[in-house]
Amino acid sequence: MNQSSLNIALGTWSWGEGAVGGDEVFGNHFGEAELAPVFEAARVAGLCLWDTAMVYGMGASEHLLAAFTRECPREDIQISTKFTPQIAGDAADPVAEMCDNSLACFGTDYIDMYWIHNPADVERWTPPLASLVKSGKVKRVGVSNHNLAQIKRATAILAEAGVALSAV
């Protein structure tokens, strides 16, 4: 697969059932039975970049997507997921903790694109991304929902560590 040509991401925000799934925002009830044919049709059509986040359905989205991606060769799937500051735990490094939880969920040793989901504290949450890239747990990093000043600051913080901001 030519990863440089990936320009369509399939989002999974509405995946999951009940109050922590698609019901909360979208009013839908998409579980594994409804989503398996969607995933397979996308895969057959050559779509492979999947965007999710731990906060989507409080894990439901990642778990559903992981159930499907485990059946595919890892090199055929691009996983994009996010660190969401508002649900960060009390660990010494909440960014790494959330990333490790996503890695375990997907049964993989790397995430293709890892995002800071929103700009709650650019100075606090951006530096740990560089460590994740350097460790090999994350291939590329991005920021989501940041304004221009926050994007510039995140870019500078990462550049100081020798890491590029790959997506906004």
Report the location of each language-model feature.
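N-terminal binding-site loop/beta-alpha segment at the start of enzyme catalytic domains
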Residues: M1-I77, K134
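Conserved beta-strand positions
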Residues: L10, T52, T81, M113-I116, ...
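Feature marks short, surface-exposed loop/turn motifs that line or immediately flank catalytic pockets
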Residues: S14-E17, Y56, P85-I87, H117-A120, ...
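Active-site mouth loops of central-metabolism enzymes
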Residues: A19-A33, F83-D93, N118
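Glycine/proline-rich, positively charged
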Residues: E40, G89-V168
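Short internal beta-strands
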Residues: S80-T81, V168
